[in-house]
Amino acid sequence: MSNLFQNYTRADLEFIKAEGNYLFDTQGKKYLDFSTGIGVTNLGFHPQVQVALQKQAEQIWHTPNLYQNSLQEEVAAKLMAGKDYLAFFCNSGAEANEAAIKIARKATGKQEIITFQNSFHGRTFGSMSATGQDKIKVGFGDAVPHFHYAVFNDLNSVKALVTENTAAVMLELVQGESGVLPAEQDFVTALADYCQKNGLLLIIDEVQTGMGRTGKLYAFQHYGIEPDIFTLAKGLANGVPVGAMLAKKQFGSAFGPGSHGSTFGGNKLAMAASSAVLDIMTKAGFLEQAWENAHYLQEQLTSALQVADTVTQVRGLGYMIGIETTADLGQLVKATRDRGLIVLTAGTNVIRLLPPLTLTKDEIDQGIMILQEVFEQHN
């Protein structure tokens, strides 16, 4: 009998070792990882990150935020790359989004925030309330008020919700949990313009889309916008718990001493890993190669699955790919796992692929072959 709350549906499988883009179970079986721990180990199990962690662990891994932390300054500088942002570090995407919600309200003096139907921003009370999915709120009582949910990719539905008390609009550029649904370019451009002209802050939730996942460091770079606030987590430290909220420097006074904080946020172990990740991702040619390989994966996968009657669409952005299907998701996940490939689901009818950015062409071909076999079997 387990000593754990049963709030997860766990497969009867444990991974105890990893090398590069592969996981190994207790029996020594090898699996190609197209899930990256739900978009976390974006670099696979990378030796450079491992060395950074080992080196930092031998020195000091935590100090309180009552003292200077040069590693936080280093990571913040790398994240903003010369742009006029300030950074706050925490431990997760939910915490990062909580910080974004708080600073948006405090900086504007307004309370209402518009998010989107089928969005996902986290499971803490504020981030859960921001999420446009009722299923994750069942049984927890009244949500935090003043959140309103627009229709994704529909600017008119946003405008209809705006009042004199609206502080911000909060958006995922790809709705990952609901089925890998990319935002349309025209919508994002028009939304950013509308927010700017009407004094609304634009918050971009990059928890899943950030850190190279879409082929650029941040997904908003694909859309040619610069948000007032954006949030990061998942891939930032490649598996070490960390989150970050970045906001324009003009809002710095909203987070003065005592206004917000995190005991573990920005600890030296997480910052050492984050710094190593950023060094790898910003190395000349790295993200360009990842983008090229992701395009190859999506193109070849679309071609390979054309004969599968149960596949209705392959879509995504970079290495964030959804296979929409009428087949049973549970059976597909198990069948791919049995063949040595780990994948995810999203929404009610999508197989979600979040592979490491470090995939080789051979590994891509291997994954496509397994997926083709599985979908042919479940045709």
UniProtKB/Swiss-Prot annotation:
Q: Which reaction does it catalyse?
A: N(2)-acetyl-L-ornithine + 2-oxoglutarate = N-acetyl-L-glutamate 5-semialdehyde + L-glutamate
Family annotation (PROSITE patterns): AA_TRANSFER_CLASS_3
Keyword Amino-acid biosynthesis belongs to the record: yes
Q: Name one GO biological process term.
A: L-arginine biosynthetic process
The cofactors it requires, by name, are: pyridoxal 5'-phosphate
Is this entry keyworded Transferase? yes
EC number(s) per entry: 2.6.1.11
Highest rank taxon of the organism: Bacteria
* Alphabetized GO MF terms: identical protein binding; N2-acetyl-L-ornithine:2-oxoglutarate 5-aminotransferase activity; pyridoxal phosphate binding
Q: Which residues carry this modification: N6-(pyridoxal phosphate)lysine?
A: 234
**Note on how the cofactor is bound:** Binds 1 pyridoxal phosphate per subunit.
Where does the chain bind N(2)-acetyl-L-ornithine? 123, 262
Pathway linked to the protein:
Amino-acid biosynthesis; L-arginine biosynthesis; N(2)-acetyl-L-ornithine from L-glutamate: step 4/4
Q: What else is known?
A: May also have succinyldiaminopimelate aminotransferase activity, thus carrying out the corresponding step in lysine biosynthesis.
What HAMAP family does the record tag this protein with?
Answer: ArgD_aminotrans_3
Q: What is this protein called?
A: Acetylornithine aminotransferase
